[in-house]
C-alpha cells in the first residue's frame, strides 16, 4: 500500500470500512463518490466488511500493515502448497482441522488413502496430524499408543485418527510476505511483544520472491486471489503513463522500488488490478501545478499497463479502454482549475471531439468542495491529519508547518522580498521553544541570526503559533 500520508490514508479508510461500515458508506455518499464512481467502486473494490480478511504482500512490512493486523483485517492466511491453498479458496476445507479435512485431501488426491511416508510428513508439516504420529513397522503409531493400519479407508484407522491423531488448526500459514520491516517504535514494540509463533505469520523473503512471479505461478495465483496492488505516483499523463521515480530533466526523486513489478503482476494474475494513487496537484516554485498532465518527458509505468487511477476527487478505471475513454476518465478526477487546459490539449491532439464537454458532475473538483463533504466527519474526529498518531513533539509540528510556509514563500521573488522584510522583526517570545528545538534560540553568528529571524516570522505568519 505504499508509505507516507497516502499509504496511511488507504489503511485508515480500510479500517473505517471494516469497523464502521455505515460511516464509511456515508462518507462516500457525502463526498459524491458513490454517485459519480459507484460502478467502479463496487466492481473493483466493494463496499462490505472484510469477513474473510486480507493477505498482504509488500516489499516493506511497516506500521500500516501492523494496524490492519491488530484490527482483525489482515487475517487471511496463505500456504505454500497449491493443492491445500486451492481447497481453502474453494471452501473444501477450513483452517480448523477435522475429519472432513482428511476426507477432502484424499478426495482431491493430495494424499492417498494408504499413507505413504510423504503423505504423513505433509500432514504433520501443515499441522493436520499431531506431530507425534509416525509410521512404525508398517503401522501408524498414534499419541495415545494405539497402532493402526495406515489406511484412511479402514474405519478403525479413521476413528482412531479423529480421536487422538488430528491437529487443531492448519499450521505454517502466512499473513504477510515481505522483504524487510521498517517502522516506528510502536511497530517494533508490537513485534517484540509477540510470541515466536505469532511472528512467524510475517514471512520475510527475498525481494525477488515478493516482487516477481518466478517459481510457481499456480500457487501465486491461488495466494493472490482478487489481488489489489496499490502504489503511489507523482504524475499521470492523460494517456495513462505514470511518473513515479524521476523528473523530466533527469533528476531522480526516488527509487522505483517494486512498483513496476507489482503493476506487471496485476496484469499477469487473474482478477488482479493495479491501483495508482496520486494527489491531483502540487506546488512548484510557489505555483500550483496539476499532477495530471497531457504529456511528460519521463515514464515509470507505460501506458499499455494503465489500470485504475485514484486522486482525491475520484477513481478512473482505465484498463482495456480506448485513448478517448482514458482521457475522459482522467479529466473526471483532475482538479477543476486545470481541466480546461487539459481538455484543450486533448482536443488539439484530436484525441477528443471538438464538442466534448466534461460532465457537470465532475466540474467541481476543488479542495473547498471536498472539504465541505468531509467537514461533518472531521468535526467528529474522523479523517484526522495523523490517523495513527505520530512521534513529533508539539514544537516539531509547529516547525513543520512553518518550514513548509518558508519553503513556499522563498520560491518566488515577491515571497523572498517579504522574507527580507521579516529580518527587521525580532522573533515573538512564543517562538522560543521552537527556536530552541532548532538550536537557534541563541544565534552564534550572522547566518544563525538570519535563520532565527526567518523561522520566527514563519512561525507567526503561517499560523503555527
Q: Residue spans of the language-model regions?
A:
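Conserved alpha/beta enzyme-core scaffold
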Residues: 1-465
Amino acid at each position: 500500500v505504499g508509505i507516507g500520508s497516502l499509504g496511511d490514508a488507504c489503511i485508515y479508510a480500510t479500517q473505517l470500512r471494516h469497523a464502521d461500515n455505515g460511516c464509511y458508506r456515508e462518507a462516500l455518499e457525502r463526498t459524491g463518490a458513490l454517485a459519480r464512481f459507484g460502478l467502479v467502486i463496487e466492481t473493483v473494490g466493494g463496499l462490505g466488511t472484510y469477513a474473510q480478511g486480507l493477505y498482504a504482500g509488500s516489499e516493506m512490512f511497516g506500521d500500516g500493515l501492523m494496524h490492519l493486523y491488530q484490527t482483525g483485517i489482515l487475517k487471511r492466511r496463505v500456504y505454500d502448497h497449491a493443492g491445500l491453498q486451492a481447497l481453502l479458496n474453494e471452501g473444501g476445507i477450513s483452517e480448523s482441522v477435522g475429519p472432513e479435512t482428511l476426507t477432502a485431501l484424499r478426495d482431491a488426491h493430495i494424499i492417498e488413502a494408504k499413507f505413504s511416508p510423504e503423505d504423513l510428513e505433509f500432514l504433520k508439516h501443515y499441522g493436520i496430524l499431531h506431530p507425534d504420529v509416525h509410521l512404525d513397522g508398517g503401522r501408524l503409531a498414534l499419541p495415545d499408543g494405539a497402532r493402526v493400519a495406515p489406511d484412511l479407508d479402514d474405519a478403525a484407522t479413521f476413528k482412531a485418527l479423529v480421536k487422538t491423531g488430528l491437529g487443531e488448526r492448519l499450521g505454517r500459514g502466512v499473513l504477510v510476505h515481505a522483504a524487510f520491516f521498517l517502522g516506528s517504535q510502536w511497530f517494533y514494540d508490537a513485534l517484540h511483544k509477540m510470541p515466536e509463533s505469532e511472528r512467524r505469520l510475517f514471512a520475510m523473503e527475498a525481494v525477488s520472491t515478493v516482487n516477481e512471479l518466478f517459481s510457481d505461478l499456480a500457487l501465486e495465483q491461488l495466494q493472490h486471489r482478487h489481488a489489489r496492488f496499490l502504489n503511489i505516483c507523482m504524475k499521470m499523463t492523460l494517456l495513462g503513463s505514470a511518473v513515479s521515480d524521476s523528473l523530466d530533466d533527469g533528476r531522480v526523486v526516488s527509487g522505483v522500488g517494486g512498483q513496476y513489478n507489482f503493476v506487471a503482476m496485476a496484469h499477469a494474475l487473474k482478477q488482479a488490478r493495479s491501483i495508482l494513487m496520486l494527489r491531483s496537484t502540487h506546488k512548484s516554485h510557489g505555483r500550483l501545478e496539476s499532477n495530471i498532465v497531457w504529456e511528460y518527458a519521463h515514464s515509470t509505468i507505460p501506458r499499455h499497463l494503465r489500470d485504475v487511477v485514484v486522486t482525491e476527487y475520484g477513481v478512473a478505471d482505465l484498463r482495456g479502454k480506448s485513448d478517448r475513454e482514458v482521457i475522459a476518465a482522467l479529466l473526471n478526477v483532475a482538479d477543476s482549475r486545470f481541466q480546461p487546459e487539459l481538455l484543450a490539449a486533448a482536443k488539439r491532439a484530436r484525441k477528443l471531439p471538438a464538442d466534448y464537454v466534461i460532465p457537470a458532475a465532475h466540474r467541481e473538483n476543488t479542495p473547498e468542495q471536498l472539504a465541505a463533504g468531509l467537514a461533518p466527519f472531521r468535526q467528529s474526529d474522523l479523517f484526522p491529519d495523523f490517523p495513527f498518531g505520530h512521534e513529533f513533539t508539539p514544537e516539531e509540528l509547529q516547525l513543520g508547518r512553518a518550514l513548509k510556509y518558508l519553503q513556499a514563500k522563498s520560491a518566488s521573488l515577491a515571497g523572498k522580498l517579504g522574507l527580507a522584510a521579516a529580518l527587521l522583526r525580532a522573533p515573538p517570545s512564543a517562538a522560543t521553544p521552537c527556536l530552541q528545538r532548532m538550536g537557534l534560540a541563541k544565534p552564534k553568528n550572522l547566518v544563525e541570526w538570519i535563520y532565527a529571524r526567518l523561522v520566527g516570522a514563519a512561525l507567526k505568519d503561517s499560523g503555527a503559533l
